[in-house]
Amino acid sequence: MPEPAKSAPKKGSTRTAAKGGKKRRKSRK
């Protein structure tokens, strides 16, 4: 569930994720 859910928002939320820190969290991994 978390994999597909992140894949969808990650593509369109890439900019928002970087601002919120979602992409940063993935990079930290």
Curated annotation (Swiss-Prot):
Kindly state which keywords UniProt assigns to this record, in alphabetical order. Answer: Acetylation, Chromosome, DNA-binding, Nucleosome core, Nucleus, Phosphoprotein, Ubl conjugation
Residues with the modification N6-acetyllysine, per the entry, are 6, 11
Q: Which GO terms describe its cellular component?
A: nucleosome; nucleus
User: Keyword Ubl conjugation on this protein?
Assistant: yes
User: Which positions bear Phosphoserine?
Assistant: 13
Q: Which GO terms describe its molecular function?
A: DNA binding
Q: Where in the cell is it found?
A: Nucleus; Chromosome
UniProt feature, compositional bias: Basic residues: 20-29
**Subunit record text:** The nucleosome is a histone octamer containing two molecules each of H2A, H2B, H3 and H4 assembled in one H3-H4 heterotetramer and two H2A-H2B heterodimers. The octamer wraps approximately 147 bp of DNA.
**Family per record:** Belongs to the histone H2B family.
Q: What is this protein called?
A: Histone H2B
Q: What is the lineage of its organism?
A: Eukaryota, Metazoa, Chordata, Craniata, Vertebrata
